[in-house]
Amino acid sequence: MYNYLLIRYGEIGLKGKNRSYFEKSLVKNMQSALKDLEIGKIKSTQGRMYIPLSGSSDELTRVLDRVTRVFGIETVSPAVKVESDLEVIKKTALQVFKNHMDSISPQNQVSFKVDCRRADKLFSKNSMEMNQILGAHILDHVPGLKVDVKQPQILLQVEIREDGTYIFTEKIPGHGGLPIGTTGKGVLMLSGGIDSPVAGWLAMKRGIQVVGLHFHSYPFTSQRALKKVEDISQVLSRYGTGPTGGFKLITNHFTDIQKAIQNYCSESMWVTVMRRFMFYIANRMAQKEQAMTVVTGENVGQVASQTLESMHAVSQDVVNLPILRPLAGLDKKEIMSKAETIGTYDISIRPYEDCCTLFLPKNPKTRPSLEQTKREISKLNFEELVEESLEKTEIKYFEPYQDITEEELTFDV
Ligand SMILES: Nc1ncnc2c1ncn2[C@@H]1O[C@H](COP(=O)(O)OP(=O)(O)OP(=O)(O)O)[C@@H](O)[C@H]1O
């Protein structure tokens, strides 16, 4: 029955002179998310956007599933748009209301409220009069109701605008943030763990177009470990509908670097030296990608190695771009709950090894100094090892909706 999806955006609306740039980006990102669904032109007017719908519930399920993942959106409402004629509005408001009642199958008396907004001042009734007319009409036709203006179970909203009247009962939350691509590009150091996918998601939420970079130590780490990172990339691709759409994953073959570290460096410094290589390569990749930042899933104090000394030793002088650590202020519980919401948690907890866990020394240095780290690195042919690993780099693109199954759709309408 719904013929439009109303889109509300938050922070973009505060952007002053740059507002239209952010609005256009949001429209483009929504178009990109919906590109294979034969949706009509998205309209943008008076601080709102409208996606035309065909009326089929299957289409609405898909559109909701995709659009609520597009960053920049605060809330969305499936709505019925009709001509601004009193009798037509009454009839449709009742239908929309009954439709909502059917979806909640109430046991007891249901409370409701009508909230009408008249933006079109040429319409003959004002908002208060419309609230009364529509409230009375619904009470007359649906048994077992009561009006509650403070905490109604059902809020029927009616917006009388110049181009027609929109009627709806639901406000479904999006993730907020800014449209991807509006703040630049970043390279995300993506492991198979719980944290880095969440860090990448948070960077995407702030409008950064993220490219994943994974270090893989085949045959020490298995193909199944790599598959885990690919599956995470697939999930992230569903939020990544920026200017180019989808998600790009760069895989760096790290085996020879790890072997060299094991052979020549002090055992307690293995992890620090390995991380310093990773940051150096991430910086190189960021330059190649014309990215402006390196994003990591590091936390402060979550594990023994995540000390400020260690962060300094692994990245100082090898990264010349800002490093974003979006998880720095979050507790593990908060990160896990975010990973569940995003849909990466179940993949991240699959029990496959990762190159860091495999090469874990018995007594890793938790507060390494920069000098000590540089001394260890000087035992290796740093540049040559990096160049060799870069030659074996692979790139894979993940399209957001190519393999999505019915079960994976989050909306059921
Ligand atoms: N194999 C890898 N490939 C790419 N980045 C990695 C890899 N291993 C670690 N990193 C980066 O280093 C960060 C810190 O890793 P560490 O193992 O200390 O923490 P973690 O809390 O286990 O992180 P995660 O849960 O993301 O694996 C990761 O969040 C990620 O950004």
Swiss-Prot record:
GO terms for cellular component: cytosol. Keywords: ATP-binding, Cytoplasm, Nucleotide-binding, RNA-binding, Thiamine biosynthesis, Transferase, tRNA-binding. HAMAP family: ThiI (MF_00021). It holds the Pfam family ThiI_fer. Its main location: cytoplasm. InterPro entries: Rossmann-like_a/b/a_fold, ThiI_AANH, ThiI_fer, ThiI_N, THUMP_dom, THUMP_ThiI, tRNA_STrfase, tRNA_sulfurtransferase_ThiI. One of its GO terms (molecular function) is tRNA binding. The lineage of its organism: Bacteria, Bacillati, Bacillota, Clostridia, Natranaerobiales. Pathway: Cofactor biosynthesis; thiamine diphosphate biosynthesis. Residues 61-171 form the THUMP domain. The keyword ATP-binding applies. Its EC number is 2.8.1.4. This is Probable tRNA sulfurtransferase. One of its GO terms (biological process) is tRNA 4-thiouridine biosynthesis. Catalyzes the ATP-dependent transfer of a sulfur to tRNA to produce 4-thiouridine in position 8 of tRNAs, which functions as a near-UV photosensor. Also catalyzes the transfer of sulfur to the sulfur carrier protein ThiS, forming ThiS-thiocarboxylate. This is a step in the synthesis of thiazole, in the thiamine biosynthesis pathway. The sulfur is donated as persulfide by IscS. ATP binds at M189, L190, H214, F215, R275, G297, Q306. It is found in: Cytoplasm. Belongs to the ThiI family. It is an enzyme of class 2 (transferase). It catalyses: [ThiI sulfur-carrier protein]-S-sulfanyl-L-cysteine + a uridine in tRNA + 2 reduced [2Fe-2S]-[ferredoxin] + ATP + H(+) = [ThiI sulfur-carrier protein]-L-cysteine + a 4-thiouridine in tRNA + 2 oxidized [2Fe-2S]-[ferredoxin] + AMP + diphosphate; [ThiS sulfur-carrier protein]-C-terminal Gly-Gly-AMP + S-sulfanyl-L-cysteinyl-[cysteine desulfurase] + AH2 = [ThiS sulfur-carrier protein]-C-terminal-Gly-aminoethanethioate + L-cysteinyl-[cysteine desulfurase] + A + AMP + 2 H(+).
